[in-house]
Each structure stands twice: as C-alpha cells, then as structure tokens.
Amino acid sequence: MIDWVTAVLPCLHVPVDAGRVLSVAPDGSVEWESVKFSRVTGSFQSSISVRSQGSDGNGKATHLYVDGNPSKWLQGHNIVGSDDLNGLMIAFYARMLSLLNIPHHLESYRQVLSGQYELKRVDINYMFELPTLIDVRSWLHAAEFKAKTRHGRPATAKGTLYFGKNSRRWSIKAYSKYDEVNCGKKAHGVPEEIKKTGLVEWSKNKLRLELTLRALQLTDINLNFAKNWSTETAYTVFKEYMGRIEMSGNTLLTDTQVINLPSALRMTYVCWKQGICVTDMVSRATYFRHRKVLKEFGIDIAVTVDRVDNSNVVPLIRVLEAKPASIPSQYDNLIFSSNRVSSF
C-alpha cells in the first residue's frame, strides 16, 4: 500500500497564510524567512502538512507542497490501504482544496489528473503473516542479528528495525503494526470505529515491512513523477528493494573444519566467533578476502555472531520471499478505492 507521500502539486491559488518563520540579524535586518506549513485535518482528525510554493508574478502561488499520509488522511487509518498512488492523490487533492476553500484551477487540476507533478518521497508497505504476535517480535529480534543491507546492520528503536535509517536515498523498516497501534501514542492510534471492525485484531500476527524512497532515489529509478506510477508499481518496487536484505544463516564450523583452515583464516574465524570486531584486527583487503572464503562455509563475518536460535533463520528468509498477507474482503470498505471516492 501507499503510505506517506511528499509531493509538489500544481495549484494556482491565493497563498495559504500560515505565518512565517524569520531569522533576524542583530542589526534588525531579516536574514531569511520561510513560509510555515498549515495542518489540514482530514478523516478522523488525521492531518497533512501543506504549504504554498512558487509565484505567477501576480500575487498567486503556483504549487502546493504537501507532506503526509494520504491513506490515513482519507481512510482514518493506515493499517491496510491502496496501491493506487494516482487515485489516492487525486482524491486527496480534491478534498484538500475544498477544506482550504481554494477554487479549482482547471489547468492545475488537469496536471494532477495526468500525474504531471513531482514526488519527493513515497513510503510503501505491506503486511506479512506469521503464526502469532510472539513470532512477529521474535522475527524482529532475530533479524536484528541476522539481517543486513548495503547500509549495514539494522538499527533498533522501540521494537522497530531500521535499515539505512539516515540514508538520503532509501530505507527499510520492520515492525509490528499491532504493537504500534497499541503503544498509547495518539499519532499511532486508530478511531474506535475502526477498532470495532476487527481490523486491528487482524493485524496482530502481521509483520509490517516498509520501504521509503526519497527524492534522489525516486529520480534515479525514474519514479519522481506520478505519471510514471501504475497500480502495479508499488509492489514491484517494494519487492525489488526487499530483495536487498541479506539474511545470514551462520553456523559454527566443526573442530575438524577449524583445524583445516589456514592459520590466518583460522584466527579471523576464532575472533569472529568470540564476538570480536574483525575489521579492528585485520586490514580492509584481508577482511574482504577472508570474508569471501568463509562464505563458502556458510559464514558471513560481516554479521556479528549472536545467541539467537538458528531455528529463526528459515522463517526470516521465508517471510521475505512470501507474498503479502491477503486482506479479508470484509475490510474492503475500509480501503480507499477510486471507484468509491465519494465514501472517503
């Protein structure tokens, strides 16, 4: 599903007045100023940040810079949602103009309808089914030690796993949506009307995997304009990036195998086994040479040896190879559809 979107939408309009932030020098001169964001509230008190941008030379702004979660804004929740980025943004655009009392500008509207606008960030996520909530938490714990991407090992914070958390291009995070909804924070909660449908309970044994694509990466893969997105794009891109997560199935060598290793390689293996950072012990060239050889034995010294039960390794891999969890038809009316725009 499409989750968070940051976009620059064509919209000729009288600038939305939300105030300004100024930097004033000691002599009283203004060093710089920036227009503040307005918070536009949608369904169930969910809001999106909006700011006027550009100028036509006659006092009107030419674009709206929007930043937020159109799925949650329209649906009241983002537990499940639509892969239709263009449909979501068209419905969001129409509703937003109405709430801001901005008259429709025909040419601007045509541009939005045809996807002629720039995307600065897109988040895509899907749910993957495990037997229980305990299994979801165990998966996250095991992946902390067993998984990595080109960004390296994941960082963890409050039960969420982050791959490339501070990357300016792309990142992945994994977490329990059920735990997030029930963490007690207002921003992550869902309305009682949604809870009563059973959707939150349905998410209890689901692992959430989320891909964030930022401006530089969107440009590189030619998805920085909405016109290049179809309803299949989200899952296709998501699957490709999930394939970048490497899972280690590290197992310890037998005594005979250790004895038969060349002495230098044996020392590297023993240090790794004891939890010592190998990169502190050998040169960069030696590290990569030893890593390549040890990988033939099913050992990746780039992944720290840990005490996690190896029985978790197969589920780690199988989850990433599996298809996202099927959403029961009883929840169809809780998911945005361009065929039912009037209900959102």
From Swiss-Prot:
What is the superkingdom listed in this entry's lineage? Answer: Viruses
Quote the Pfam families the UniProt record gives: G2P_X_C, Phage_CRI
- Please provide the Gene Ontology terms (biological process) for this protein: DNA replication
Query: Is Ligase among this UniProt entry's keywords?
Result: yes
Alphabetized, the UniProt keywords read: DNA replication, DNA-binding, Endonuclease, Hydrolase, Ligase, Nuclease
* GO MF terms held by the record: DNA binding; DNA ligase (ATP) activity; endonuclease activity
EC number(s) on record? 3.1.21.-, 6.5.1.1
Q: Is Nuclease set as a keyword in this record?
A: yes
Q: Which residues form the signal peptide?
A: none
Q: Name the catalysed reactions.
A: ATP + (deoxyribonucleotide)n-3'-hydroxyl + 5'-phospho-(deoxyribonucleotide)m = (deoxyribonucleotide)n+m + AMP + diphosphate
Which InterPro entries does its entry note?
G2P, G2P_C, G2P_N
Function (record text): Isoform G2P plays an essential role in viral DNA replication. Binds the origin of replication and cleaves the dsDNA replicative form I (RFI) and becomes covalently bound to it via phosphotyrosine bond, generating the dsDNA replicative form II (RFII). In turn, viral DNA replication initiates at the 3'-OH of the cleavage site. After one round of rolling circle synthesis, protein G2P is linked to the newly synthesized ssDNA and joins the ends of the displaced strand to generate a circular single-stranded molecule ready to be packed into a virion.
Q: Which family does it belong to?
A: Belongs to the inovirus G2P protein family.
Put simply, this protein is called Replication-associated protein G2P
Q: What gene, per UniProt, encodes this protein?
A: II
